[in-house]
Amino acid sequence: GADNAAAAYDRIMAAAAAHAPDARIDGVLVAPMITGGTELIVGTTTDPIFGPVVMVGLGGIFAEVFRDTALQPAPVSLEGAQKMLRSLKCFALLDGARGRPRADVDAAAQAIVAVSEFAKRHADDVAEIDINPLLVRDQGKGAIALDALIIPHQTQTSEAAE
C-alpha cells in the first residue's frame, strides 16, 4: 500500500544521494507490475540510403541471444508488420505454441506501424528508437512498451564542438 510505496521512495532517494550526491532528482515513477505475455524488441535505426529501418524480434533478455529479427524500411504497413512478425522463428510463441495463450499479434503489429510512422515522420531528428521489451499480452489485451529509448541525431553544433 501507500506505506510500502513511501518506504520504497525513501530507500531510492537515499541510495541516489549516496551514489550521486549532486544528482537532480525530480521524482520517481510508480507503475503497476505487469507479468505474463511475450517480450519483443521493436526499434529503428537510420540507414544512410534507406532512411529509417524498422526491426522487430524476440525481446527482453533473449534479444541478443537468439538474434531472431526481421527488418523493413519505414514506413511499415499493418500488413507488412504482420508479415514481419510471422517471419520470426519465435512467432510460434506468439501464436500459442505448446498450450500457451495466443498473443495479441494485432496489437504488436499496430505498435510496429506506430513506431515506423514516428521514425519516418521524425527522420531528421531521430537516429534510433529502441523499445525493449514491448510486452505483447494475451489476445485482445494489447501490447505495452515497458522500456523505451529514443536517440536523436547529433546536432551540427555538438559535432563541431568535438
Residue ranges and their predicted role:
Residues G1-E162:
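ATP-dependent carboxylate/acyl-activation modules
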